[in-house]
Amino acid sequence: MGEDFMHPPFQTYPSKNSEGKKHIVIVGGGIIGCCTAYYLTQHPSFSPSTHHITIIESRRIAGGASGKAGGLLASWAFPHQIVPLSFQLHQELSDEYDGENNWDYRRLTTVSLEADVREEVIENYERLSKKAYNLNVPPPKKRPGYISNKFNIGDSNSSLSSSGSSLKNDSASNEEEGSDIHVSSSVPSLHSLTNERMRSHTNSASDLDSVSPVEQLRETNIHNPLPADLDWIRRELVNDWSSLGGTDTTAQLHPYKFTHFILSKAMETGAVDLLLGKVVGLKCDEMDCVHSLKYLPSVVKNRRNSRGHAENPDIKLGTIFNDENAKPIEINDIQQIVLSMGPWTSKILKDCPISGLRAHSVTIKPSEKTVSPYAILAELKVNDREFFSPEMYARKDEVYVCGEGDTLVNIPESSDDVEVVSEKCDELYHYVSKLSPTLSKGHLLRKQACFLPVLNVPTSSGPLIGETNVKDLYIASGHSCWGINNAPATGKLMAEILLDGEATSAEISSLDPKLYFDATILS
């Protein structure tokens, strides 16, 4: 199949393919929307002769968190209602479609570790070992008014971590490869979950408190050494670690590739159209049913020609925008509408309690051709009272690194407009380089940022899956840091709800959107 699936065919105006058929419209071309389309086409009640699906995406497939995520999969993720199903479906999809080659699926080991990367500790080790360590990555520059996302010891409200499942590609296409505001949310952060697991599994070094930091680290490595094949980390700086999962419970994939592949399989049926446009409103009738929407067609400049090259080399390939002065186009032959818009859901449903958490990430080409397959959730001591908490995911040809989230800016109009704070990316690269010579001697490939969809209710971590209190209007959103992990289950369950009238593969009554907001309040 090659990588032809990375460039799906699209249109900007509705086709006539839905005439005389049950027409299901999915708003949002991220991993949730694409998995929903795929599992609809796989449902035994679905037939291209009687059903048609239109995916409406404002900018590009997997242009947000679905393309910018780390891609960590874990059987111990949340929520428990759908995680076992989704983890199993990921394996089944890989087995069926050669996920190892098509979207870099593989099982791996996940660890949590604490390391001391203070300058004095590093200098002491180098002096004692008589081995110099040259850090090739300079400290990040701070712009005026910029404060990093490190948090002080004792803070009980550190910002929600952006996970390996839900994160990052630069603010444009992935085709070309004040103070921090802490988030108060019922959603547990990935770091809080793993720290809890670490406390229950690790060999504590608390009995070493009376000795020097260097001696502590040396003693810890004697009694609790890191796995031998985790050789791209400076193990002498690690003072505690824990296994969070082996190949039986954790895996990874490249989310951008996966999303495009699964969409291509849905479109192969001939029953799925991809429409580029920005949905600007839904229309309810007097019975609180919704069967029509309006959208602004996206304008695409500099498309690829028949040879796959840009038509105009002076314009960025695939530049997309919406003409806000254009007359909206109405689609009114819809039987069911699914909103899988992630943090943009509340742009349409004003009462929906889903907001966005911005997360930065970088990808690094390591100095070694390959690094051993580990996902690492780190807590780095950077000075006497500050920690920094990056996550590192070794891919086949690069290492993905992400940091904690922030709410410093509002959600922009599209995923292309997400502001990337270069200093945050530089900070990520600087601190992980202290821990890894392989990364320090490598080179930075990409700086990027995206928004994660967070459900802001005290009684649920999300997501919301199912029909709203508006008939035939459905939502699949609010997956927080586990959107990549839980996408197949969400897609399968949505297909059951849309075609059978109920979810049968998992019990998800607690994820019912009707419990949390009023969908009749439209934009």
From Swiss-Prot:
Q: Which GO terms describe its cellular component?
A: cytoplasm; cytosol; late endosome
Q: Please note every region of biased composition (Low complexity).
A: 157-172
Q: Where is this region: Disordered?
A: 157-189
Say which domain of life the source belongs to.
Eukaryota
* Alphabetical UniProt keywords: Cytoplasm, Endosome, Oxidoreductase, Phosphoprotein, Transport
In-chain residues carrying the UniProt-annotated modification Phosphoserine: 189, 204, 306
Q: Where in or outside the cell?
A: Cytoplasm; Late endosome
Single biological process term from Gene Ontology = retrograde transport, endosome to Golgi
The annotated subunit structure for this chain is: Interacts with BTN2.
| The protein, known as | Putative oxidoreductase TDA3
